[in-house]
Design a protein with these regions (language model features):
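Short, solvent-exposed loop/turn at the beta-strand->alpha-helix junction
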Residues: 1-4, 24-32, 52-59
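Inter-repeat linker/turn residues at the boundaries of leucine-rich repeats
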Residues: 14, 38-41, 65-68
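A generic tandem-repeat structural signature
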Residues: 59-76
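Short secondary-structure capping/turn segments at boundaries of alpha-helices and beta-strands
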Residues: 7-8, 33-35
């Protein structure tokens, strides 16, 4: 799994509202890690497609208190 800190720094928009992590090999563990990151509270759109995050990864994102502003999530 890639370094989550580096990915957030490189892939989060300047306004903190869009996170594009398409095809970054995150898997379930990466999705769970993202779901704990307080610095992502302003994210409104996130692309996690082609990451193989699985059911548990999706559950972690869905139940996360971090992503309260999330309105658009791509998992395809």
């Amino acid at each position: 799994m890639p370094n989550i800190d580096d990915l957030i720094r490189d892939k989060l928009s300047k306004d903190g509202q869009v996170l594009n992590l398409k095809a970054q090999f995150l898997r379930e563990v990466g999705a769970k890690e993202l779901s704990k990151r307080e610095e992502l509270k302003e994210v409104r759109a996130m692309d996690l497609s082609q990451n193989g995050i699985g059911d548990e990864g999706v559950k972690a994102i869905a139940e996360s208190t971090v992503f309260v502003n999330l309105r658009n999530l791509n998992l395809a």
